[in-house]
Amino acid sequence: MLHKRASEANDKNDNTIIGSDLASSKKRRIDFTESSSDKSSSILASGSSRGFHGDSVVQQIDMAFGNSNRQEIDEDLHSRQLAVYGRETMRRLFASNVLISGMHGLGAEIAKNLILAGVKSVTLHDERVVELWDLSSNFVFSEDDVGKNRADASVQKLQDLNNAVVVSSLTKSLNKEDLSGFQVVVFSDISMERAIEFDDYCHSHQPPIAFVKADVRGLFGSVFCDFGPEFAVLDVDGEEPHTGIIASISNENQAFISCVDDERLEFEDGDLVVFSEVEGMTELNDGKPRKIKSTRPYSFTLDEDTTNYGTYVKGGIVTQVKQPKLLNFKPLREALKDPGDFLFSDFSKFDRPPLLHLAFQALDHFKAEAGRFPVAGSEEDAQKLISIATAINTGQGDLKVENVDQKLLRHFSFGAKAVLNPMAAMFGGIVGQEVVKACSGKFHPLFQFFYFDSVESLPSEPVDSSDFAPRNSRYDAQISVFGAKFQKKLEDAKVFTVGSGALGCEFLKNLALMGVSCGSQGKLTVTDDDIIEKSNLSRQFLFRDWNIGQAKSTVAASAAAVINPRFNIEALQNRVGAETENVFDDAFWENLTVVVNALDNVNARLYVDSRCLYFQKPLLESGTLGTKCNTQSVIPHLTENYGASRDPPEKQAPMCTVHSFPHNIDHCLTWARSEFEGLLEKTPAEVNAYLSSPVEYTNSMMSAGDAQARDTLERIVECLEKEKCETFQDCLTWARLRFEDYFVNRVKQLIYTFPEDAATSTGAPFWSAPKRFPRPLQYSSSDPSLLNFITATAILRAETFGIPIPEWTKNPKEAAEAVDRVIVPDFEPRQDAKIVTDEKATTLTTASVDDAAVIDDLIAKIDQCRHNLSPDFRMKPIQFEKDDDTNYHMDVIAGLANMRARNYSIPEVDKLKAKFIAGRIIPAIATSTAMATGLVCLELYKVLDGGHKVEAYRNTFANLALPLFSMAEPLPPKVVKHRDMAWTVWDRWVLKGNPTLREVLQWLEDKGLSAYSISCGSCLLFNSMFTRHKERMDKKVVDLARDVAKVELPPYRNHLDVVVACEDEDDNDVDIPLVSIYFR
């Protein structure tokens, strides 16, 4: 879910979609041999319960895809994708050659997603030439390409997406042997006879060649996958192995194991787990996978007799062992007759997949007999296809469809020739992900047929057959499904797209191809206040490397206008929020047809949702997280709004856990980022705030007079007096002493205050799970991780003071000698040290009766420090930037976290994994983004039609890793009833004529409602309990708002909104809609 930003594009942007040289940009690359520890490799170490060994699985993959240990990953470019796939999967992608045959819209979408993902090569095959018809769905074609070979016309524009991928074309007729050089072949425009021939070859090839057949025909789509007789899935879901912290283990046959109630267990019956760090019952620490059963939220049973094992004392971690899975694919020849279980997407269409299995076969027979597709609107062709389907169905035996839905087949026939952009985008995401699975063994493949339709997207009213006729237009394919009149609705739509990141780029491409806002009355406004970064380029495909640093919205708008020059698009660089309501004013919102969100944060979504509620505008919402995506249709008066239901807030670790009792690497990284920001950003910023306005700053601190003010002043004194740095050696000394404080002294103090045998007030062991007893570290310059951390920390400290970095810091020997010169004082434990152990505590700073006096002393000290500084002295606060590997930020944060993890015997992580967690990187890939936008645009057809009932709309949740597709009808809004009236959150009561307070109260009384409170914003305009408020009865409400609430009403605002609290005749509260009082 992505919300991003923008500025002016330069002249290059006129050709943004067609030209790039990613190879020209300087890249930091990491060799796979340095660290290729993917989850799949560790999973396989323990073997499999399915009768094959991990080593053989790896050999199978490596034999199929070759050895590519020399391949490198550009972490800056692929960081979001790495968070989904891991290094090993990326390595296998880099070694994979893919053939895509059929370069209409679906082929182009599949190719785009795979080129962005970074496979080794993509070969585009097509024997046909570009027609104007193709421009409805293929974003790489322009009108100038009409008459050229489709593959040749696609190569350069797709190559520009990623110059690290070799993109080539093939225009001859394929034979089976041509497929031997590929790991995966995808056919999107092929007869069933040829598909069976090619699939037989791929299925029997050694090693097998993964075969994918995909079709989109109008509003219908299908996918078939055959990855060979035995295909190893190394990681079925892509989720991290689940873990638990052990609290007790019984000595009995079928041992009962309980875990701490810190987090619910996610184990399932039959899972294999391994144990570590168990004290007492050490027999379990042998690394052997063990089967569990009777899983509950905080306990499970071990399928093993522990009667004669040692008695459990304490500690222990239990970790799920993810098992490989072997799939036996059937070749297409057999699967057509025995398809097995279909993958469902919409359980309101439970009988649909068998019918579509029949329909696609019937279409193939029709094309073979007629040499063409059925003509849109032709009843004769539709009846012929229905007859063929009926005949096939008669001979299907157990597969026979009980009720051949002729109406559905008629729709299928009418749109069979058309490849629609939303369907191409959706299936391009699905098929692209299946190719990644075939290349890598990562995630569970689609097994084996998937059928989908969105027949609900068709116009709600019947369309005359003449309206389907081609107009010699780039939209003819879409017209053949929806009709020319509906196409006019699309072209005249006024759309607001909020965000132009990954989702936004896909939306703009889709809308341009569909012709949305491309008519004389249409307009699309896109806004985004973000700029383009290198990490965007692997998903946000409208951007090129030369656009880095430019405004997202303007670059995206320029690129979308290249796709369709008729696109009426305006790009803005404003954040959408209360502060920009002068830009996005009432007139702007009232003029809109629909709003399409492409945001990446909940608060922005909620604001846009509130605006759509207020102005009663449809909102199409979507979001992605790795392989997962969701879409929601918010339709005035038909569905609930986005804010009507929310996910529960993420569980936050208690402050005391993060600061003193961490038990996982997330706690360590949370602490590390907090310390980084406190030391290098917040404290220097406080120093500058003080130096800029000493009197005002110290007055505010004295006024606060609390523990937080005391703590802030202490940090300023440390910066300007005790720990002030003037040379780089000072910075190195500071960093070395900071290491000693964090990882030695604080730990010694902690275990002095709470020894290993300490007990709680109830007599229970203090150091019981999930607490882990820490050990202080001992510094040694021979440990490169310690030396690198201290050097990186010193460099950033020097940056805050503007101190030059000497060249010798790059020499480990010289740096070690400089660190060794630092004199480290001996540690003396404090008897009165207070360490917070209360999990409900919200601060680590404790108040004292002496705070005011201490603050006075500190102010005197910093005043003295100020006089010792030059007048222009300022520090340089450092804002954390995760995506620049040369700035030492992640070196410091990863170092802080790993040293702390070492204190508590928590497994450490590499810098990349640390960046994912500490940088709060949202995992993202092109495939799920493409699918989400395709689904949203299928809903857009319904919105712009305007006549659909709620039953026609769909909200979707999908997970391409499993794969899982779950579609459901949106929930209706909650209805409130009073007397003969009813309303929902979509309603707003309007009162015109600039009424007085008395007139408003009377107006409500006429509805049987007694208003006891009226407020505007946070200010109370009227309360029936306050006698003086009765003096306001004859004042205009708008004047009360100006005088009492100090509301400023700009010229573009013609009404005022007030919240009214009411009771009915029985004194029951009644929630009424927002009341809008018009005064102009």
Curated annotation (Swiss-Prot):
Signal peptide: none
Function in brief: Activates ubiquitin by first adenylating its C-terminal glycine residue with ATP, and thereafter linking this residue to the side chain of a cysteine residue in E1, yielding a ubiquitin-E1 thioester and free AMP.
Catalysed transformations (reactions): ATP + ubiquitin + [E1 ubiquitin-activating enzyme]-L-cysteine = AMP + diphosphate + S-ubiquitinyl-[E1 ubiquitin-activating enzyme]-L-cysteine
Protein species of origin: Arabidopsis thaliana (Mouse-ear cress)
Assembly: Monomer.
Further details from the record: Both UBA1 and UBA2 are able to activate ubiquitin and transfer it to the E2s with equal efficiency.
Annotated positions binding ATP: 502, 528, 539, 552, 600-601
Family listed: Belongs to the ubiquitin-activating E1 family.
Start-end of Basic and acidic residues biased regions: 1-14
Active site, UniProt feature: 656
Stretches the record annotates as Disordered: 1-20, 29-50
Record's keyword terms, sorted: ATP-binding, Ligase, Nucleotide-binding, Ubl conjugation pathway
Protein name as annotated: Ubiquitin-activating enzyme E1 1
Stored PANTHER family: SUMO-ACTIVATING ENZYME SUBUNIT 1 (PTHR10953:SF162), UBIQUITIN-ACTIVATING ENZYME E1 (PTHR10953)
Tissues and organs where the protein is expressed, per its UniProt entry: Expressed in leaves, flowers, roots and stems. Detected in germinating seeds, cotyledons, hypocotyls, vascular tissues, anthers, filaments, pollen, style, stigma, sepals, petals, ovary, developing ovules, funiculi and silique walls.
Gene Ontology biological-process entries: protein ubiquitination; response to other organism
One GO cellular component term noted in the UniProt record for this chain: plasmodesma
Feature: compositional bias, Low complexity: 38-49
Gene: UBA1
Metabolic or biological pathway, per its Swiss-Prot or TrEMBL entry: Protein modification; protein ubiquitination
The protein's Enzyme Commission number: 6.2.1.45
GO molecular function per UniProt: ATP binding; ubiquitin activating enzyme activity; ubiquitin-protein transferase activity
